[in-house]
Amino acid sequence: MTTPAYLLANFGGPRHAKDLQEFLISLLTDRDVTGTFLPRVLHRHLFTFIAKKRVPKVLPQYQSLQNWSPIYFDTETLAKTLSEILRAPVIPFHRYLPSTHEKTLLALRTLHTRHVIGIPLFPHFTYSVTGSIVRFFMKHVPEIPISWIPQFGSDSKFVSLITCHIRDFLQKLGILEKECCFLFSVHGLPVRYISQGDPYSKQCYESFSAITTNFKQSENFLCFQSKFGPGKWLSPSTAQLCQNIDTDKPNVIVVPFGFISDHLETLYEIERDYLPLLRSRGYRALRIPAIYSSPLWVSTLVDIVKENSTVVAEELIKSGKKHTGIR
């Protein structure tokens, strides 16, 4: 059997100020993300305008981070490390950094194999993110049949990794599990996407349930962050929970288990918005770093890649057209 090549797909993030507008326009004009059914041209004009208006608001947030968003650099480094371990090409892809796309597409087109496995760096599948990535490659390289690992949030090795990551964090700080309330935070999604067949929330709950089986002495909540735009989103929101939670546990610890790399949602939103809110209410509030920082992350991902079955692109997205605005 031909040795496969791998496509390591991530969200992308601005590396510096010049990337920010490009990043926001690419993100918000993706109809898989915004879910509108506006005519294509109108959609692009409207959300380009919205993206440009958001730049002055978001720019100071990114500038306050030490090295902007580390997600780009984490993905590049991970691709090189995986390539050495798997002894195969591993091509990185940054969905919302269009200036990097041609390099990825060229690398795919010049491969000496047509056996390509896609690795989306998202534990839980949603048509708005993983689905968007899959459709991108169906459009731009239809001649290359990529099969995908759809999700791994409930994979026993991922569950064990998150469990060890949390326990290591507690041990380093001398905190007992019975003294903790954990807020397991994932990115939010509009409820209408779920009602139209997106499996995201179901997978998040399954993953949360599998992980918290290992934490019976703590108080545990699943919550959803980063709401953008109108309409009802999955609840409880992380912000609401931080504002309203009533627990006798002295330590409230946010666990961003839906995010592989730290980026704006963890380094700014959790760190600068949610933790101060909890502290103002008298709790010791902490954030566990994203799983990328774990020394066991790479070996766990290698096992997941080797042991999980893949799904062809057409099968993966066939029921995902209801909410995306795709015609």
UniProtKB/Swiss-Prot annotation:
- Signal peptide (UniProt feature, chain positions): none
NCBIfam families, alphabetically?
hemH
Q: Which residues bind Fe cation?
A: H187, E265
The reactions it catalyses are: heme b + 2 H(+) = protoporphyrin IX + Fe(2+)
Please give the GO cellular component terms listed in this UniProt entry.
cytoplasm
Q: Does the keyword Cytoplasm apply?
A: yes
Identify the keywords attached in UniProt to this record, alphabetized. Answer: Cytoplasm, Heme biosynthesis, Iron, Lyase, Metal-binding, Porphyrin biosynthesis
Just give the chief location class: cytoplasm
Tell me which EC number(s) this protein carries. Answer: 4.98.1.1
In its keyword annotation, does this UniProt entry include Iron?
yes
- What name goes with this protein? Ferrochelatase
Extract one GO BP annotation from the record. heme biosynthetic process
Q: Which GO terms describe its molecular function?
A: ferrochelatase activity; metal ion binding
- Please state the pathway this protein functions in, per its UniProt record: Porphyrin-containing compound metabolism; protoheme biosynthesis; protoheme from protoporphyrin-IX: step 1/1
The family assignment reads: Belongs to the ferrochelatase family.
Tell me, what does this protein do in biology?
Catalyzes the ferrous insertion into protoporphyrin IX.
**CDD domains associated with the record:** Ferrochelatase_C, Ferrochelatase_N
Compartment(s): Cytoplasm
Q: Which gene encodes it?
A: hemH
